[in-house]
């Protein structure tokens, strides 16, 4: 299956940002008033074909964005390689590991949907098993409407404390 045929979670921009009253650029903490309203809107997600959403700024694709902090308090930083899924990000640096979210059939809450997706991405991207990501902490959101990628994506930010030996890069250059 092509990555563009993947069924992903999106939220209508007008619903997510309350007709732009809650729009922001940068990082928004979970306890901020806008952050709380945006979190509430996440439960109104829809499932759409990724290829149809890549150029449609009327929807925001939800992305898990996981910060990995080691036992010394250092945050992982890495360069996005050509083997990664989003060509427009190749060669750029990132402090977040993650990717597109999918529906979780049978999930009891939006919290479960977010966590299951973040844990799946951690396993895929850096080999971090579920039992080693249980200390995952939801921090808030990142958004950047100033570039083509950011106009159609919004990151749900988590922080996970890990041991350096538990993390291994899975992505390679092609």
Label each region the model flagged.
Residues 3-13, 52, 62, 81-83, ...:
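Active-site segment of metal-dependent pyrophosphate-handling enzymes
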Residues 59-63, 70, 90-96, 153:
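Short connector loops at helix/strand junctions that flank enzyme active sites
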């Amino acid at each position: 299956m092509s990555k563009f045929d993947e069924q992903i979670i999106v939220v209508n921009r007008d619903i997510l940002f309350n007709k732009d009253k809650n729009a922001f650029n940068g990082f928004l903490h979970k306890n901020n008033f806008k952050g709380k309203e945006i979190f509430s809107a996440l439960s109104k997600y829809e499932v759409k074909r990724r290829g149809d959403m890549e150029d449609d700024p009327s929807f925001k694709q939800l992305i898990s964005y996981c910060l990995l902090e080691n036992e010394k308090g250092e945050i992982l930083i890495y360069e996005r390689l050509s083997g990664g899924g989003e060509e427009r990000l190749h060669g750029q640096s990132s402090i977040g590991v993650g990717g597109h979210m999918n529906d979780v059939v049978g999930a009891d809450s939006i919290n479960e949907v977010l966590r299951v997706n973040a844990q799946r991405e951690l396993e895929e991207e850096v080999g971090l098993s579920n039992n080693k990501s249980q200390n995952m902490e939801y921090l808030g959101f990142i958004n950047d409407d100033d570039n083509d990628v950011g106009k159609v994506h919004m990151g749900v930010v988590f922080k996970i404390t890990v041991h350096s030996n538990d993390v291994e890069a899975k992505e390679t250059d092609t």
